[in-house]
UniProtKB/Swiss-Prot annotation:
One BP term from GO: proteolysis
Lineage of the organism: Eukaryota, Viridiplantae, Streptophyta, Embryophyta, Tracheophyta
Gene name, Swiss-Prot/TrEMBL: SCPL5
Organism whose genome encodes this protein: Arabidopsis thaliana (Mouse-ear cress)
E.C. number(s) listed in UniProt: 3.4.16.-
Active site, per annotation: S183, D363, H416
Name recorded for this polypeptide: Serine carboxypeptidase-like 5
Glycan attachment positions: N108, N347, N379
Length: 438
């Protein structure tokens, strides 16, 4: 009898220990009221934390959550995924659509400063900025035994993250929910939307109040994205008429891994012509190093800021997570198993979800021509034809709306991500998320 009682007690103690460990990791969320480098208390509500993913919750995904500054009880809830794969979501928070930005002072050895922005999407929406896949930003694995990330696998992990996050934040379970991102997240976001939609029908209660998704300059299919660089470069006067006509005649519109020797030579000539161009926004100087007069200097300042011991303490970073933080880590063993996200867009449209697809019109990486091409391939009827959308009396870009609830828009003068035209992108998003015509 004594042995039996002892065994039961040991089992109970083990169970309590496991519960404690799970609580340590899964429920590790903290309200952040002050951040080093920002003067005074934060003028918005910021929460940071980890959510455990997997059977043993070995993967710990880190997030920043900012409540809507308007009406968090009713405003939409957005999940933001940065590209890469392997780029921290702080890229969105500090450069693209968050309420804070780096103050662009020359680094002098002291902690870089933060300043408030006027273009934050959190003015009208609550936002979760998620570091994914594992190995990105502050997300990490407690063991080496976990499923290596992939496009389709990330869609499932993100869905699991959302289910667990919403179970801890049930006050947001009825808010309209959207998935958003840019660049490489163009491969993951549509698959994530489909995964959530499938979960709502098959398994999960309560369902996530999924309404749609937002994508900026999304990578969609390598061949489409690359093939349209040539006509885009010609339109931007980066290559000559003669080279463009030769490329069209010899390569017949297929410029990816050409087997024809003459086509290969012409593609190499194209590469030489565009080698000195900033791929993200062709009108910006190409910067090799992060010097103070360069646009990407803010990335260096962010690295200094995030790696400060007091900043990491304020953000409640688990000490076991990572060593030095990097904005984009491209050493993640990642499987690119979705070759085209176009079928996911088609399925999501059939299921009735709204979508805003926007393109900075000076991006050479994913030209607006490529995005236009796959949107056009969906073959949906047009309900609002090509027209300028305005900010006061100035053209912010051009837009077209389709019968499948998809809106396509360009951002005039914009680049690969929203950071190049954050105010204009905010105006566009604000109108769309509130159901207004652009």
């Amino acid at each position: 009898m004594a042995n039996y009682i002892s065994s039961v007690l040991k089992s109970l103690l083990l169970l309590l220990h496991l519960v404690f460990l799970i609580q340590q990791h899964v429920d590790s969320a903290s309200i952040v009221k002050f951040l080093p480098g920002f003067e005074g208390s934060l003028p918005f509500e910021l929460e940071t934390g980890y959510i455990g993913i997997g059977e043993e919750e070995e993967v710990q995904l880190f997030y920043y959550f900012i409540k809507s500054e308007r009406n968090p009880k009713e405003d939409p809830l957005l999940l933001w995924l940065s590209g890469g794969p392997g780029c921290s979501s702080i890229s969105g928070l500090l450069f693209e659509n968050g309420p804070l930005a780096m103050k662009l002072d020359v680094y002098n050895g002291t902690l870089p400063s933060l300043v408030p922005t006027t273009y934050s999407w959190t003015k009208t929406s609550s936002m979760i900025f998620l570091d994914q896949p594992v190995g990105t930003g502050f997300s990490y694995s407690r063991t080496q035994q976990y499923n290596k990330p992939s496009d389709s696998g990330e869609a499932k992990r993100i869905h699991e993250f959302l289910q667990k996050w919403l179970s801890k934040h049930q006050e947001f379970s009825s808010n309209p929910f959207y998935v958003a991102g840019d660049s490489y997240s163009g491969m993951v976001v549509p698959a994530t939307v489909q995964e959530i939609s499938k979960g709502n029908y098959q398994c999960c209660s309560p369902p996530i109040n999924l309404q749609g998704y937002v994508l900026g300059n999304p990578i969609t299919e390598h061949a489409i994205d690359y093939n349209y660089r040539i006509p885009f470069a010609h339109g931007m006067a980066l290559i000559s008429d003669e080279l463009y006509e030769s490329l069209k005649r010899v390569c017949k519109g297929e410029y990816v891994d050409p087997r024809d020797t003459e086509c290969l030579k012409l593609v190499e000539e194209f590469s030489k012509c565009t080698k000195g161009v900033c791929q993200e926004v062709v009108i910006k100087p190409l910067c090799v190093t992060e010097t103070p007069n360069c646009y990407i200097y803010r990335y260096l300042l962010t690295t200094y800021w995030v790696n400060d011991v007091n900043v990491r303490k304020a953000l409640q970073i688990n000490k076991e997570s990572i060593g030095e933080w990097v904005r984009c880590y491209f050493g993640i063993p990642y499987t690119h198993d979705i070759k085209s996200s176009v079928p996911y867009h088609m399925n999501n449209s059939i299921n009735g979800y709204r979508s805003l697809i926007y393109s900075g019109d000076h991006d050479l990486n994913v030209p607006f021509l490529a995005t236009q091409a796959w949107v056009r391939s969906l073959n949906y009827s047009i309900i609002d034809n090509w027209r300028p959308w305005m900010i006061k009396d100035q053209i912010g870009g051009y837009t077209k709306t389709y019968a499948n609830k998809m809106t396509f828009a360009t951002v005039r003068g914009g680049g690969h991500t929203a950071e190049y035209k954050p105010y204009e992108t905010y105006i566009m998003f604000h109108r769309w998320i509130n159901g207004q015509p652009l």
